[in-house]
């Protein structure tokens, strides 16, 4: 009788454990499938806290010049530019700003990461130092055949500071996530006015 009771107890424990595991997986699956919260909407002049960066978008414009603030364009390319004030809120100089703004597809075509230029010196932006706000330009290269938007939509991507990384045990900025969306009108010069949608 003692052996049978031990087997019964083992089967019962296994059954309960399995049931709890299945229920937990179901609950986590349901919670994970929930839609993410709506992103905060920002416009030109909005002050945005984005983890290690503070960004204030100023204006968006289009250029067909061969060189836009130090960023060279190839034949058959145009530039979609977002000017913004950018402030490094960390304690170290960094150039981790290229993925701060993610432009939504233009005319259904995905857009690569921008090149970032320093407006006051018209050259590609090097390290950005802590506490020193700079006016910068995010320059996306687009094919000349791309239909230009009259309004620009871009996600603002922030990272979270971790004092100890799980993999290396060092501090850093990790886990990029969308913290908002910038919507602003695109200024089109006369030379490219015929291309706007």
Residue ranges of model-derived segments:
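Extracellular Ig-like/FN3 beta-sandwich strand-entry sites
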Residues: 79, 133, 147-149
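Short, surface-exposed ligand- or partner-binding patches at beta-edge/loop junctions that are enriched
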Residues: 142-169
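Hydrophobic core residues within well-ordered beta-strands of beta-rich domains
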Residues: 53, 80-82, 134
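Short solvent-exposed strand/turn elements
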Residues: 70-81
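Membrane engagement elements in two modes
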Residues: 1-66, 74-75, 172-197
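Short, surface-exposed secondary-structure boundary micro-motifs
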Residues: 85, 138-139, 143
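The feature marks short-to-medium sequence segments in extracytoplasmic or secretory-pathway proteins
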Residues: 61-63, 74, 87-136, 163-169, ...
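Short strand-coil-strand connectors
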Residues: 49-53, 106, 155-159
